[in-house]
Design a protein with these regions (language model features):
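Viral virion structural and adsorption modules
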Residues: 1-7, 172
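Conserved binding-pocket/active-site segment within a compact domain
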Residues: 103-172
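Context-gated lysine
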Residues: 7, 50-51, 71, 78, ...
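Solvent-exposed edge beta-strands and adjacent loop segments
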Residues: 3, 18-102, 149-166
């Protein structure tokens, strides 16, 4: 395979959302459900596209290749939560030469429940993966074969101060 010019790993192209015929929707938010599991239970991970003789298109450079496949006798799980009470963010981080992306999923689960407390206990310090789907049908993978996603914190559980306040758990 010929050496790839690092300046040509990804080919620039025009970006015009008005011409994005395949993706007409632009609804904000995520669907009120995520798929999750333990990092150690994954047999095969999707990965970044490989360098080729010709530069990757912008779309190829922004898409993982392959599927997430669980190990035998392991499974992924689903968490449903209150609609429009979760947010997924991708932010740039790092200094020049060390840039990367930080993904943050913030879920508010209406009503304090034993099951949510159990989830918090089961995931403390554990490497995880989460699959988040936005309202336009795009899937995002938190955690990969190199590093698992970690539950960073939460605003805790609260009953609220008044009878009209929300009884909830907040997870990050």
């Amino acid at each position: 395979m010929a050496e790839v010019d690092p300046k040509l790993c990804i080919a620039l192209d025009d970006i015009n959302e008005a011409m994005d015929c395949e993706n007409q929707d632009n609804m904000g938010g995520i669907i009120p459900s995520v798929i999750f599991g333990y990092h150690a239970d994954v047999a095969t991970w999707p990965d970044y596209p490989k360098k080729t003789e010709s530069p990757l298109s912008l779309e190829e450079a922004g898409t993982l290749v392959g599927d997430l496949v669980m190990k035998e006798s392991c499974r992924a799980y689903k968490m449903d939560f209150t609609d429009e009470l979760a947010e997924f963010k991708i932010t740039d981080q790092g200094e020049s030469g060390g840039e990367s992306f930080l993904m943050d999923l913030n879920i508010i689960s209406a009503k304090m429940r034993k099951k949510i407390f159990g989830f918090e206990n089961a995931t403390k310090g554990r490497k995880m993966f989460f699959i988040v789907t936005d309202n336009n049908g795009t899937n995002y993978l938190m955690g990969d074969k190199r590093r698992g996603a970690l539950r960073a914190s939460g605003d805790g559980a609260t009953t609220g101060a008044s009878s009209t306040a929300r009884n909830q758990n907040t997870l990050h």
